[in-house]
From Swiss-Prot:
Keyword Ion transport set for record: yes
UniProt topology in membrane: Multi-pass membrane protein
Principal subcellular localization: membrane
InterPro entries: ATP_synth_F0_asu, ATP_synth_F0_asu_AS, ATP_synth_F0_asu_bact/mt, F0_ATP_A_sf
The name this protein goes by in its record: ATP synthase subunit a
Native organism: Bartonella henselae (strain ATCC 49882 / DSM 28221 / CCUG 30454 / Houston 1)
Localization of this protein: Cell inner membrane
Encoding gene, per UniProt annotation: atpB
Protein family: Belongs to the ATPase A chain family.
A GO CC term assigned to this protein in UniProt: plasma membrane
Residues spanning the membrane: 29-49, 87-107, 117-137, 146-166, 196-216, 219-239
């Protein structure tokens, strides 16, 4: 018998857990929905427990939550100044949600919701919508200064303005694709190496010896994926703070 390696893309399929339909609308509760809820619950419980008992000697959980708090707060202050701190709840929630979602997806048989482009695109659109809404609310038409750089010769100003507009509205695409592609590629690579190990072991004693290198690679890639999971949350947060600065200081 020939054994077929598991499909590495199968882990990203969306499956219905509870069928819900209203008219022609499919509102089914899927595995993606479940892990979105799980991510929110895990994040909330962790932050509640870590912040409920504040001692002079912080626990490990308290230290982690304080490090996350200081990271987001310092990044916002450096990017947008003191005025940017009003966005702290949004940025901290995004950072925590993405980080926990990435880590949850690393456990076997768990779903990585950040490997779904619609999830990452929704998060990116939330950021851009906040920038546009606050920009017009705070500065009115003056927010459009963002698309008109100072010091540009009048002759090429229309071209530069068009480039700035395209660059601004491409931000949610690049922001979402970066997170989506990194999580997707990493999990596919893990699945391929894991499937190769199983296939080699199925061959027999010779296959067991041949599976040692893929096993080492799988362990190394898993460790790397934990680093990538943090880095992607970090990058998303830093870019979010930079974009929010455009809403606070559109003329800079």
């Amino acid at each position: 018998m020939t054994s077929h390696a598991p499909d590495p893309v199968h882990q990203f399929e969306v499956s219905r857990l509870i069928n819900i339909s209203i008219g022609n609308m499919d509102l089914s509760f899927t595995n993606v929905s479940f892990f979105i809820v799980a991510t929110v619950v895990v994040s909330s419980v962790f932050l509640f427990i870590s912040s409920s008992s504040r001692g002079l000697v912080p626990t490990r959980m308290q230290s982690v939550s304080e490090m996350a708090y200081e990271f987001v707060a310092s990044t916002l202050r450096e990017s947008s100044g003191v005025q940017g701190m009003q966005f702290f709840p949004l940025v901290f929630s995004l950072f925590t949600f993405i980080l926990v979602a990435n880590f949850i997806g690393l456990f076997p048989y768990f779903y990585t919701i950040t490997s779904q482009i619609m999830i990452t695109f929704s998060l990116a659109m939330l950021v851009i919508f906040t920038v546009i809404s606050y920009g017009f609310y705070k500065h009115g038409v003056g927010f459009l200064k963002l698309f008109v750089p100072s010091g540009v010769p009048v002759l090429i100003l229309p071209l530069v303005t068009m480039i700035e507009v395209i660059s601004f509205f491409s931000r949610p695409i690049s922001l979402s694709l970066r997170l989506f592609a990194n999580m997707l590629a990493g999990h596919i690579t893990l699945k391929v190496f894991s499937g190769f190990i199983v296939s080699m072991i199925g061959i027999g004693i010779m296959g067991v010896g041949g599976s040692i290198l893929p096993l080492i690679m799988t362990v190394a890639i898993t460790a790397l994926e934990f680093l990538v999971a943090f880095l992607q949350a970090y990058v998303f947060t830093v870019l979010t703070c930079m974009y929010l600065n455009d809403a606070v200081h559109p003329g800079h």
